[in-house]
């Protein structure tokens, strides 16, 4: 499956589609419990990760929000 991940081409070998949770695992995303996922321009609710299928040609962004400063 060929995707665009964080603006760069990416391939997940041997898969035609995955749910978002499986994609996080397949791509070895760091701290998956803290990542926000944008799929094809839409921010996803974490509760939808299992039921949402990522398909060939999709665009995925992994976003991390961090606090800090004064």
Model-derived segments and their meaning:
Residues 1-70:
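Ubiquitin-like/PB1-type beta-grasp interaction modules and other compact soluble beta-rich domains
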């Amino acid at each position: 499956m060929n995707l665009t991940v964080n603006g760069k081409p990416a391939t997940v070998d041997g898969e035609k589609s995955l749910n978002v949770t499986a994609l996080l695992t397949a791509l070895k995303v760091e701290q998956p419990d803290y990542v926000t996922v944008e799929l094809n321009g839409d921010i996803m609710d974490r509760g939808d990760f299992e039921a949402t299928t990522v398909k060939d040609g999709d665009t995925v962004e992994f976003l991390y929000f961090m606090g800090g400063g004064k």
